[in-house]
Amino acid sequence: MSYFFGSTVPFAEPLWYSRPENFRYNESHRRLRESVRGYIEAEIMPFCTQWEADGEVPSHVLKRHAALGYAAALINPSAVKEHMHDVRLPGDVPPREWDEFHGLIVADEVARCGSLGVLWALGCGTAIACPILVNYGTEEQKAKFLPPVIHGESRFCLGITEPEVGSDIANLVTRAEQEGNYFIVNGTKKWVTNGTFADYCIAAVRTGQAGRTGISLLNIPLDVAGVSREKIESSGVASGGTASITFDNVQVPVENLLGEKNKGFYMLMSSFDHHRSWIAANCLRLARVCLEDAYQYALTRQTFGKPLINHQTIRLKLANIGIQITSSYALLESLTEMRQNLSVKMGQVHRGIGGLCAITKVAAARTFELAVRESQQIMGASAYTRTGPGLRVERLSRDMRVLVIGGGSEEILSEMSVVQEQKDLNRCKSCP
């Protein structure tokens, strides 16, 4: 049996795709990898350019994506298996066998479509919002809201950022006042991914005093009176459905409160570990997409009487991208192994990984930035054109910045990683 899988372009695939000496992956991982790649290449990749031009992914595509098990895979199959009913996971992996490395494979292989907008449309809201519902929702809430998501009949988004509040979550101003059996919500959430087509928004709202101790999380239906949405025209990710959502005296049943009242800030902080690991996986696969396209271009493009690939300068650029991808992915795999060994549920925090998740996201985003820049340098005008061999690199050059900023900016996460790691090391030192 051959262990080789995928591209022969150097550094275009994770090392375990071509090397059998790897203890982290087994036959179910290889089966999943093959299943996801076949699906993405046949049903998603050929249509990304059209969907980005249209500014949306067709609803029947999103529903089929969920029906094939990808919504459940993004949330945490072992935690939602009782809500899956007839839905089977990609690669036919049993929910009880699903681990963190299966999740990494899905995040990696779906991103190979080469369009961040399409990638986000297929499941960003599910990936970042639904783990909160799984980890903090009541059994009644999970039974009501999870089955439609898993079957592709409804979609979620996460509303945190506001027009005047970005990284400073503790000072958000969207307010929810309790009146009897309802919360009355007023305020605006901005840059909400999937906000144009989501059915529900898990929103951070102020229910108490100023600061982090006065924030709660509400699951707000988006088809009720007082909710208005406006699509935000961004540099990239056109099909991702980025929106501004305004709440004007919106009535939300008190039973839609997730977790404890005024504990929402801490719930959000715990959810970011999974969120940032997912972003890191996306960044590194998209960096590989750039590398692969630049390498293939360099094989055929002639300059000064020989192919680009025969110029040492070009090979050095490709090597630099490969160095960053390989080292960053090794960090991501180590973090994934740590999460697995600690039996961390997706979306929950565990002592010792918050700072590592932050710095892994920073490293992956920097790698993606480098890959975009150097691939454009190699491909020249072809990678500045929305048609031809450089169209994916051109598109990703517009998509890339949102992954550097979103999910925590490089500056915020770098500073946080030092502070958090110092706390964790001091805690570890005092452990028996």
UniProtKB/Swiss-Prot annotation:
Disruption phenotype: Reduces the production of AF-toxin and pathogenicity. Signal peptide: none annotated. Keywords: FAD, Flavoprotein, Oxidoreductase, Virulence. GO terms for cellular component: cytoplasm. The keyword Isomerase does not apply. GO terms for biological process: fatty acid beta-oxidation using acyl-CoA dehydrogenase. Pfam families: Acyl-CoA_dh_1 (PF00441), Acyl-CoA_dh_M (PF02770), Acyl-CoA_dh_N (PF02771). Its EC number is 1.-.-.-. GO terms for molecular function: acyl-CoA dehydrogenase activity; flavin adenine dinucleotide binding. Its cofactor is FAD. It is an enzyme of class 1 (oxidoreductase). It comes from the Eukaryota. Pathway: Mycotoxin biosynthesis. Gene clusters encoding host-selective toxins (HSTs) are localized on conditionally dispensable chromosomes (CDCs), also called supernumerary chromosomes, where they are present in multiple copies. The CDCs are not essential for saprophytic growth but controls host-selective pathogenicity. Acyl-CoA dehydrogenase; part of the gene clusters that mediate the biosynthesis of the host-selective toxins (HSTs) AF-toxins responsible for Alternaria black spot of strawberry disease by the strawberry pathotype. AF-toxin I and III are valine derivatives of 2,3-dyhydroxy-isovaleric acid and 2-hydroxy-isovaleric acid respectively, while AF II is an isoleucine derivative of 2-hydroxy-valeric acid. These derivatives are bound to a 9,10-epoxy-8-hydroxy-9-methyl-decatrienoic acid (EDA) moiety. PANTHER family: ACYL-COA DEHYDROGENASE (AFU_ORTHOLOGUE AFUA_2G16630)-RELATED, MEDIUM-CHAIN SPECIFIC ACYL-COA DEHYDROGENASE, MITOCHONDRIAL-RELATED. Belongs to the acyl-CoA dehydrogenase family. This is Acyl-CoA dehydrogenase AFT10-1. It comes from Alternaria alternata.
